[in-house]
Amino acid sequence: MAKASKGKHQSGPSNHSESIDLVRKALYGNKKVRSLKMNPDMWEKHEVINRAWRIHEYRQEKQRENLLKNQFSAMKIACEELKHTSETLYKAAMSDSINRRFPVETRTPTDTPPRLSK
């Protein structure tokens, strides 16, 4: 049997939190964001480009929202038209049927068979 040493032998970091910090740095990297060092002219160009990009993204988002609003209103109008045309078809379309032929949860078929676990 080996003789137990009197002092604690530490080959790694001095305490537990340092080792956790080292693991976090290794896994996730350093989260500190370095500021860009630019001359004033380059900084102004950078700001103009960022502003233009934000405006572009804002306009795209508004366009998407308008498209979705239009789709929703068209669906609503179509449902109302169906309701006026045929009440039975409207009820069938609006019912949440459990006996669907292809449920949403069904996996898509693939060309290869699934892997069997060993």
UniProtKB/Swiss-Prot annotation:
Complex formation: Component of the mitochondrial large ribosomal subunit (mt-LSU). Mature yeast 74S mitochondrial ribosomes consist of a small (37S) and a large (54S) subunit. The 37S small subunit contains a 15S ribosomal RNA (15S mt-rRNA) and at least 32 different proteins. The 54S large subunit contains a 21S rRNA (21S mt-rRNA) and at least 45 different proteins.
Species the sequence originates in: Schizosaccharomyces pombe (strain 972 / ATCC 24843) (Fission yeast)
Biological processes annotated in GO: mitochondrial translation
Ranges in a coiled coil: none
Gene3D superfamilies according to UniProt: 6.10.250.3440
Family per record: Belongs to the mitochondrion-specific ribosomal protein mL40 family.
Chief localisation class: mitochondrion
Annotated spans, Disordered: 1-21
GO molecular function, one term: structural constituent of ribosome
Record function comment: Involved in mitochondrial genome encoded proteins translation. Component of the mitochondrial ribosome (mitoribosome), a dedicated translation machinery responsible for the synthesis of mitochondrial genome-encoded proteins, including at least some of the essential transmembrane subunits of the mitochondrial respiratory chain. The mitoribosomes are attached to the mitochondrial inner membrane and translation products are cotranslationally integrated into the membrane.
Domain of life, source organism: Eukaryota
Residue span of the annotated presequence: 1-35
Keywords, in A-Z order: Mitochondrion, Ribonucleoprotein, Ribosomal protein, Transit peptide
Cellular localization per UniProt: Mitochondrion
A cellular component annotation (GO) from this entry: mitochondrial large ribosomal subunit
Gene: mrpl28
A Pfam family per the record: MRP-L28
InterPro entries: Ribosomal_mL40 (IPR019192), Ribosomal_mL40_fung (IPR042831)
Name used for this protein in its record: Large ribosomal subunit protein mL40
